[in-house]
Swiss-Prot record:
One of its GO terms (biological process) is translation. Part of the 30S ribosomal subunit. NCBIfam families: S15_bact (TIGR00952). It is found in: Plastid, Chloroplast. Its main location: plastid. The gene is rps15. This is Small ribosomal subunit protein uS15c. Signal peptide: none annotated. The keyword Transmembrane does not apply. The lineage of its organism: Eukaryota, Viridiplantae, Streptophyta, Embryophyta, Tracheophyta. PANTHER family: RIBOSOMAL PROTEIN S15, BACTERIAL AND ORGANELLAR, SMALL RIBOSOMAL SUBUNIT PROTEIN US15M. It comes from the Eukaryota. Keywords: Chloroplast, Plastid, Ribonucleoprotein, Ribosomal protein. Belongs to the universal ribosomal protein uS15 family.
């Protein structure tokens, strides 16, 4: 398995106070997405993992939409730090 370069972000921010924050959850989902993506590069026919990846992507997308509506500055900072694209809001 490939070592995840973003695991340090979670360890740095892991306090009992902010585990439920939207930013922490997005970082956690991003780590899981990257880990599953590297797994699926090796195992292309693992359809259960593909389904799990789609579910996590949807959860992260909903959290990012919530965060962009509530606090646009924190949203921009987070997507810049995680190097993910800005979501299209309907």
């Amino acid at each position: 398995m490939i070592k995840n370069p973003f695991s340090g972000i979670i360890l740095k921010e892991e306090n009992k106070d902010n585990r439920g924050s939207a930013e922490f959850q997005v970082v956690s989902f991003t780590n899981r997405i990257r880990r599953l993506t590297s797994h699926l590069e090796l195992h292309k026919k693992d359809y259960l993992s593909q389904r799990g990846l789609r579910k996590i992507l949807g959860k992260r997308q909903r959290l990012l939409a919530y965060l962009s509506k509530k606090n646009r500055v924190r949203y921009k900072e987070l997507i810049g730090r995680l190097d993910i694209r800005e979501t299209k809001i309907r």
